[in-house]
């Protein structure tokens, strides 16, 4: 009798368990909202997962925070005749909560490089501009002031964001936008897992500031993959991957506006690759992996360079001018360690005015085991079904 009661109890439990399993509901994927962002944003906004049109220069003003859900897509339109860009002004914040599986994508409907202005952020972190001044006017056609003393400026958090077909050239002939432009942005800002894809200018450009860039891909951008000036001095940047294809100049262009600074940025784990047949923008004669000019400096380690050929105008590391050679190379303010070059690209060189480049002991070292950037592939690093990590 006890055995029968026990058996019935077990059967009862099994029935309940099965019933509970069968009663489980499968969550229905939520439909994306459809919307438009335009004009000045002066109050906090939460943009739910959706498809949005980006129209004109959208400015997140001081005191406002815009938060964007994972998987959202923002589309600019070249054909409407407006200049489109997403601008975060000093005091405003942009929080983008993308994920590896659901990145937030900013693109343009015709897929034309240079068709819009990308993401532009301003802060009040320190800069050192031309003549040693600590404030300057932006080069993006918006003529905004930047520079200050707030090393920990916080412009928000950008995680798993892809910007496509940006790098707008402004018709005045001197102004230009990039994929991502960071004007005096501070170390309180989070930049992680960002992609600049097929823009008509630089993928990423820093104008001074102290912000760090962690896990970044610059793919197919016409000018430089990574570029900075005005005394940018981020210390914790790592895992930068550049792939130049079609058109491209330098993997990294490093300058300091002719200021002989006693500080410099630090970047670890760098991959710089160039596809065969890639041309330079405007038929430029040089297309080096890394170029230092106008007193540019820095500390860089675990570097993998590939595809910069034996052409006389291509070297792994170029020292562009006499002042940079004398004040930065010879004074040990440029350090490149654990450099691996796949192929026969010359290691380093100068120009017609810099006939000899000789790094002090320990300031330039090579390694056969350097790995460069260490990135995990996913939807964030995939376009049209193809991985950007070549």
Q: Positions of the model-derived regions?
A:
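Positively charged n-region of N-terminal signal peptides that target proteins for export
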Residues: 1-4
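Hydrophobic alpha-helical targeting segments used for export or membrane insertion
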Residues: 8-10
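Bacterial signal peptide processing site
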Residues: 19-22
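Extracellular beta-rich repeat passengers
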Residues: 24-29, 33-48, 54-61, 66, ...
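Catalytic metal-binding/acid-base residues of hydrolase active sites
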Residues: 73
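Glycine-rich loop(s) and the adjacent beta-strand/alpha-helix scaffold that form part
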Residues: 102-103
